């Protein structure tokens, strides 16, 4: 940390911490990563686990409980700069987690022969899109592991570190990720806004990011039917199955500043 600070370039010091960095015990003592003299922030594995769990069927209420636990424990500067992701070089790729069988200790020969296709692949890509919509709209900095944007698959090392598939024709996720990135760039609420949960039950997540100038509202629908969800403004919006809606309004203004609805 001292070496990073000595550069005088505004650099930050982050490390890979697999658990809640404020409650982690290691080598028989509690770690002090985020008490002001250690790390600036961390890789946000708890968010990864919560989001993947939700799109795989976990109850929205428990998912949001896990997310809010991190939001409450981390200092604001650490939370706003935590690295949010779904895949890494040390974990199974997100699409594999979502659409394929758990490895359950099976060896590399079994893992090397796995590739999800057909209906399982199609459903997996829809769930992956939902998962990235959440990752891009939660507190923290969204990170895209190479290949997720084209649905690359793979269990643990070395299968999660395969060469990029330049021949892939999978293009559906790229424009969604590009628009989510642009929305995050233009809407200050996604960078430093407070998180407020409006609904988290069953297969529906509904939350706000409240900034100084804008308020963003995010509804994610994991269910198999269209839902009509009331907005904080008093309006209603439809959210398609396996889809999400993002509404951004300027504070003190009506109508909407921006509106996104992916079907």
Q: For the regions a protein language model found, what residue spans apply to each?
A:
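Active-site-proximal helices and loops of the catalytic beta/alpha 8
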Residues: 1, 6-82, 153-179
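Short, solvent-exposed loop/turn segments at secondary-structure junctions
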Residues: 18-21, 88-92, 149-152, 222-225, ...
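Aromatic/acidic polysaccharide-binding cleft in carbohydrate-active enzymes
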Residues: 26-28, 84-116, 132-170
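Aromatic-anchored helix/helix-loop segment that forms the rim or "lid"
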Residues: 55-70, 102-129, 186
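Short, surface-exposed beta-strand/loop micro-motifs that present aromatic residues
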Residues: 70-73, 132-134, 152, 202-212
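Conserved, function-defining core regions and hallmark residues within catalytic/recognition domains
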Residues: 172-193
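Carbohydrate-binding surface patches
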Residues: 198-231
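C-terminal beta-sandwich/jelly-roll accessory domains of carbohydrate-active enzymes
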Residues: 221-263
């Amino acid at each position: 940390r001292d070496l990073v600070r000595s550069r005088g370039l505004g650099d930050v010091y982050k490390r890979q911490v697999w658990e809640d960095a404020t409650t982690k015990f290691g080598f028989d003592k509690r770690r002090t990563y985020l008490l002001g003299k250690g790390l600036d922030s961390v890789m946000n594995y708890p968010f990864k686990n919560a989001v993947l769990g939700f799109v795989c069927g976990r109850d929205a209420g428990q998912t949001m409980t896990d997310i809010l636990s991190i939001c409450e424990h981390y200092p604001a500067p650490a939370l706003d700069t935590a690295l949010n992701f779904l895949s890494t070089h040390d974990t199974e790729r997100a699409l594999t987690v979502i659409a394929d069988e758990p490895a359950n200790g099976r060896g590399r020969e079994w893992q090397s022969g796995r590739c999800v296709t057909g209906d399982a692949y199609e459903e997996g890509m829809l769930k992956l899109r939902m998962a990235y919509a959440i990752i891009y709209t939660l507190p923290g900095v969204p990170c895209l592991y190479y290949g997720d944007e084209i649905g690359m698959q793979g269990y643990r090392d070395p299968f999660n570190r395969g060469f990029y598939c330049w021949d892939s024709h999978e293009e559906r996720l790229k424009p969604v990720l590009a628009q989510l990135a642009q929305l995050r760039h233009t809407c200050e609420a996604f960078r430093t806004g407070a998180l407020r949960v409006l609904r988290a039950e069953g297969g529906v997540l509904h939350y706000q990011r409240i900034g100084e100038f804008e308020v963003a509202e995010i509804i994610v629908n994991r269910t198999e039917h269209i839902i009509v969800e009331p907005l904080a403004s008093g309006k209603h919006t439809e959210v398609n199955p396996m889809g999400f809606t993002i509404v951004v309004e300027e504070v003190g203004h009506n109508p909407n500043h921006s509106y996104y609805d992916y079907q």
